[in-house]
């Protein structure tokens, strides 16, 4: 009997017992579907987490790690560490550094007419918007003159626009920040991402924050280098420059965000694998269900097996027939599970707010594993059918 004929007979058997076949495949469907959902959402979350942490390519973060002596004299040394404009100027002159992005943040009261809210006001330098992928929903972004002159203009988040203006356009309106007037020139697009939060925020030129609120230093500095080859040398020189400026030995250091993102990616990948493996237990349960039903099928078709053997069917042919029937059952369940997994991943991603990532390797793995389950758990029933004595089988009632 040819392979196609065996597959046709297997499909006929499945269709002849629709309800039993559906119930048998249920464990496989749930198992494959749950693994697809876990892996797809896990990989999507991992990718977004890595992107959120690493930011633009070839980026390092400057941070302050006080020594034991510094902490002993000032327990708040890390929180109070800053970067001066002189630091920024020196960093821009280091070979290999493409852009120096600096900012500082303070919590302030924002008021528009009778509406008032607490907002985070971020004083930024040029390049911050672009490097951090902040896009304008309406209005305009900052000009070079805004940064140089410290114009009293600001760009606000959608949450802040909603809190102060509701459905009215904020463009051109004046918001009072700690008693200082700031004209709204733009509204940001909502930022989506695993580490993105919908906050009430305003971005203003650093020079404006300096002149209006007395802010003199930056609290955060990141460096975008020309190429990956420059990360180590430029980062080392940058840390040395800032340490020299502040009279510290090794308190200011650099952090390669891409390396951190890669490390976190490995951890999330391990977690996804563990959770996926737990979800895969239902596949084993489904496999046991397939084996039980196939054993029942062998018992029900004992006379059929006896007739086939008396007509010349070999043990190998009987074994192949029942193995293919088992594989067809699990394969159909696997394909349905993949479809449900796609839908489930899309639903979870829509609720969680990050994309799912379903690779062809995952799909192929689901198909192959389903077939493997069919072979493993179909072997016992198929072997039992193949070993039946034709005379005893023909006597079976």
Curated annotation (Swiss-Prot):
Transmembrane segments: 22-42, 270-290, 327-347, 362-382
Lineage top rank: taxon: Bacteria
InterPro entries (alphabetical): ABC3_permease_C, CBM25, MacB_PCD, Macrolide_Exporter_MacB
Induction / repression: Expressed in exponential-phase cells.
Entry's Gene Ontology cellular component terms: membrane raft; plasma membrane
Cellular compartments annotated: Cell membrane; Membrane raft
Major site of localization recorded for this protein: membrane
Membrane topology: Multi-pass membrane protein
Function: Part of an unusual four-component transporter, which is required for protection against the killing factor SdpC (sporulation-delaying protein).
Family statement: Belongs to the ABC-4 integral membrane protein family.
Stated name of the protein: Uncharacterized ABC transporter permease YknZ
Record lineage: Bacteria, Bacillati, Bacillota, Bacilli, Bacillales
């Amino acid at each position: 009997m040819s392979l196609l004929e065996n597959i046709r007979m297997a499909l006929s058997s499945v269709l002849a017992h629709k309800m039993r076949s559906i119930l048998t495949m249920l464990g496989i469907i749930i198992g494959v579907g749950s693994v697809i959902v876990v892996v797809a959402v896990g990989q999507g979350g991992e990718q977004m987490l890595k992107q959120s942490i690493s930011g633009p390519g070839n980026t390092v973060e400057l941070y302050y790690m006080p020594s034991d002596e510094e902490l002993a004299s000032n327990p708040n040394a890390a929180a109070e560490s800053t970067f001066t404009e002189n630091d920024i100027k020196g960093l821009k002159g280091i070979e290999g550094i493409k852009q120096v992005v600096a900012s500082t943040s303070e919590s302030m009261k924002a008021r528009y007419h009778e509406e008032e809210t607490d907002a985070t006001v971020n004083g930024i330098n040029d390049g911050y918007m672009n490097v951090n992928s902040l896009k304008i929903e309406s209005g305009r972004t900052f000009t070079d003159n805004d940064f140089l002159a410290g114009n009293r203009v600001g760009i606000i988040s959608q949450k802040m626009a909603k809190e102060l203006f509701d459905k009215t356009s904020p463009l051109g309106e004046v918001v009072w920040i700690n008693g200082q007037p700031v004209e709204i020139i733009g509204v940001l697009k909502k930022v989506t991402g695993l580490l993105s939060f919908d906050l009430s925020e305003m971005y203003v030129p650093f020079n404006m924050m300096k002149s209006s609120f007395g802010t003199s230093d930056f609290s955060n500095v990141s460096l975008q280098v020309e190429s990956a080859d420059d990360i180590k040398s430029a980062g080392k020189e940058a840390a040395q420059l800032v340490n020299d400026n502040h009279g510290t030995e090794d308190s200011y250091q650099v952090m390669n965000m891409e390396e951190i993102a890669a490390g976190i990616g490995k951890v999330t990948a391990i977690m996804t694998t563990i959770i996926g493996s737990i979800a895969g237990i239902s596949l084993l349960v489904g496999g046991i269900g397939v084996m039980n039903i196939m054993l029942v099928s062998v018992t029900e078709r004992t006379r059929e097996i006896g007739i086939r053997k008396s007509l010349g069917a070999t043990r190998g042919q009987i074994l192949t027939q029942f193995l293919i029937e088992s594989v067809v059952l699990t394969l159909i369940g696997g394909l349905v599970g993949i479809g449900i997994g796609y839908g489930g991943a899309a639903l979870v991603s829509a609720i969680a707010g990050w994309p799912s990532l379903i690779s062809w390797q995952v799909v192929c793995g689901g198909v192959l594993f389903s077939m493997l389950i069919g072979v493993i758990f179909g072997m016992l029933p198929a072997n039992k059918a193949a070993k039946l004595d034709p005379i005893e089988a023909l006597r079976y009632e």
